[in-house]
C-alpha cells in the first residue's frame, strides 16, 4: 500500500521483467532497469589480459547508474562452454596482489559474461562508480571455484591504470653469456610505477632475484633500495 507516483518512480530502485506466461515465470521475454538504476551513459573500460590459460582475455566495463552505483560488465573471449569462472575485485595492484575487496558474479563460460551491481564492498564499505575509478585494485577471474589458483584473466583498475607514459632501459649481459633484456618503467594514474623486466636467454626453471641499487653501475656495489619481483626463467 505504499504510495508512489511519477516522481517517485523516476527515482525508484527497481527494474521491470516481462515473462513468457503465467505458467512459465522463469522464462523472461524482456527486462530493463528503471529509476535510480538507469545508466547515465558514463563508462570506463579496463583490459583483462590472458594469464594461465592461453586464449582467454577480455574487458571489464564500469557503467555509472543515476544513483551513483556502478554496473560492472565483464566480457571474456575464449572461455569454455559450460565453464563457471569466479571473479573478484582485489585490493592493491596485480603486481602486488591483495585480498578480495568485492565478489563479482560468476562468469558463465558459454556466454563469456558476468554482470555485477556494485554499491558497496564485501565488508559493507560504500563505493560507487566514482569511487571505483579511483580504487586501488585489480580484477581476477579464476578457472573454477575448485581451482582458484589458476587465473584465466586479470587486469588493473582504478588508480592502478597505466597512463601510457613509459621509459625503457637496457640490461646488458654480465657474468652469464647470452642473457640480456630491458627494464620498462610505466606510470600509473596514482603516480606509482609498474616495473616490467623482460629478460632473454634465462634457463628454464631458473629463478633470478632482482633489485634496484643506489648509485651507478660504475660505482657498484650500491645498497639495495628496492627489491623487484623474482624473474622466472621459464617465462
Predicted feature descriptions by range:
Residues 1-235:
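N-terminal leader/targeting pre-sequences
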